[in-house]
């Protein structure tokens, strides 16, 4: 099992870009507003679904979002998390008003669309839902959390690769202006450290940080890049502090706030200064990345980095269970 997992994780450039234009049953080239790339949504139990629909189905969308239209949606969605289930009827009505057809199964959905947004707020059914999309050979964006466990996240990426289906997953916080600038525009020179924070409310059915902590952890990894070697976790009744040590000796921290009203952000420290992240800037920057992914079928994020993010969170849980001892990420990635 270790050798199988190790060989998969090393093949980072192949995942998400395995399928060529000619191998898919449609072309994403030359699409216009009159002949758009048809998007299907799985899961109307999250505010992300109507938010993305409004962006793509706008009368005059941003140029980067032009040539797409959300045409169909399968509402479910969590059937066990009450706070998610209760939102489904209202979000059904919202997307119907934007011209979206509601369908009764994922199998029906994939027959009507070119690409898929897997938006189900509950990460537990993502593996089963993604398998139906992979079978249909449709490029797919999977919203956070990519799955309800690291094990399922790894299976999703491996099965996407085996099926030759492009996919990627991300929190919208990765694409805040300053976060993106630190990573891609050398805004503060080499990043020496980062302190990130976000709400970290709990959902008992998910590993601790997977539910909302993912947002702040994704900020941390966007700034620091991959290569975290170990984590140590410290807990109080009101917050969680996870200290990560990178292979080059740099230190990055994530602070998750359990209660109260807290924003998403952090501070990155570089050789040319420091930069503050936050507040949340909405879903449009992520939608633009999704649109580019649907056109090119190339993930903007190395799959190994996404898997490392989930290994970081699972290692943080293990550290907490063991009273705050240091836990190596490779004990998760290669177990």
Predicted regions located by residue number:
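A general structural signal for well-ordered alpha-helical segments in protein cores
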Residues: 49, 153, 179, 216-217, ...
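N-terminal glycine-/serine-/threonine-rich beta1-alpha1-beta2 phosphate-ribose binding loop
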Residues: 2-136, 161-162, 322, 329, ...
